[in-house]
Amino acid sequence: MTVLKEQPPRLLRGIPLAANDLRRTFGQREVLRGVDLHIPAGQFVAIVGRSGCGKSTLLRLLAGLDQPSGGELLAGAAPLAEAREDTRLMFQDARLLPWKKVIDNVGLGLSGNWRPRALEALDAVGLAERAHEWPAALSGGQKQRVALARALIHQPRLLLLDEPLGALDALTRIEMQQLIERLWRQHGFTVLLVTHDVSEAVAVADRVILIEDGAVGLDLVVDLPRPRVRGSHRLAALESEVLNRVLSVPGTPPEPEPVAPLPTHLRWAH
């Protein structure tokens, strides 16, 4: 398997992120309440929490799919909005166009001689031989690999992952986790992964952030060597620490997070 060709150093560096007093309200409901985050360039961060806690709203704000009610988002010293061209977002649904072949889905929106780059991206995710097939012929995991290739072709500096592995079976999910981790280590982009799976979070991330009732409840550094040994005592201890914090929060589960209409400048992994 080959890897994507060397790119200029600017494109290999992740984007440093900062959220300062970030707030988002929907009517009378405050979904995010003064979130403060500082994420170094190239860090792999997992965001976990109960359904409705605000984690998906946070990712939508980072992706530019929604606007904050207060506070600011920065990429280094500049507004995060200035880094949109270097940002890609993956969803649980691969969102492939069924009337376009795999390689055309990867090169969606590109012009010029993009096909060699698309083949390189597909090769990086192990699907070069499926380039000229239709999406309907692929499994769920393979479709997500295509979505990942569609992001990689743009050499993102920030990759936002909104439960991209949630619908996959256990073995395929682990394979995708390993693939994303390998590509992250290779290219050095910043990653934010929203997941309900605490074991997934501690297995792949440098840092696990727990969102509780719209605020940061726990910010845990996962200081373990890579590749990590699944089922190890140290990994299990970290998973238990996060789970115990989640389960210790009193009260009934919150309502589902509101979803604002998608803006016209939406950028998926394409």
Swiss-Prot record:
Region listing for Disordered, in residue ranges: 250-270
Alphabetic keyword roster: ATP-binding, Cell inner membrane, Cell membrane, Membrane, Nucleotide-binding, Translocase, Transport
Membrane topology category: Peripheral membrane protein
Subcellular location: Cell inner membrane
Reaction catalyzed: ATP + H2O + aliphatic sulfonate-[sulfonate-binding protein]Side 1 = ADP + phosphate + aliphatic sulfonateSide 2 + [sulfonate-binding protein]Side 1
Domain of life from the UniProt record: Bacteria
Residues where ATP binds: G49, R50, S51, G52, C53, G54, K55, S56
One Pfam family matching this protein: ABC_tran
InterPro entries reported for this sequence: AAA+_ATPase, ABC_transporter-like_ATP-bd, ABC_transporter-like_CS, ABC_transporter_ATP-bind, P-loop_NTPase
The protein's Enzyme Commission number: 7.6.2.14
Transmembrane segments: none
Keyword hit for Metal-binding: no
GO function terms (MF aspect): ATP binding; ATP hydrolysis activity
Biased composition (Pro residues): 251-261
All copies of domain ABC transporter, residue ranges: 17-238
One GO CC term, this protein: plasma membrane
Description of how the protein assembles with itself and partners: The complex is composed of two ATP-binding proteins (SsuB), two transmembrane proteins (SsuC) and a solute-binding protein (SsuA).
UniProt-listed NCBIfam families: PRK11247.1 (NF008420)
Family: Belongs to the ABC transporter superfamily. Aliphatic sulfonates importer (TC 3.A.1.17.2) family.
Job description of the protein: Part of the ABC transporter complex SsuABC involved in aliphatic sulfonates import. Responsible for energy coupling to the transport system.
PANTHER family referenced in this protein's UniProt entry, alphabetically: ALIPHATIC SULFONATES IMPORT ATP-BINDING PROTEIN SSUB (PTHR42788:SF17), TAURINE IMPORT ATP-BINDING PROTEIN-RELATED (PTHR42788)
Protein name: Aliphatic sulfonates import ATP-binding protein SsuB
Species the sequence originates in: Pseudomonas entomophila (strain L48)
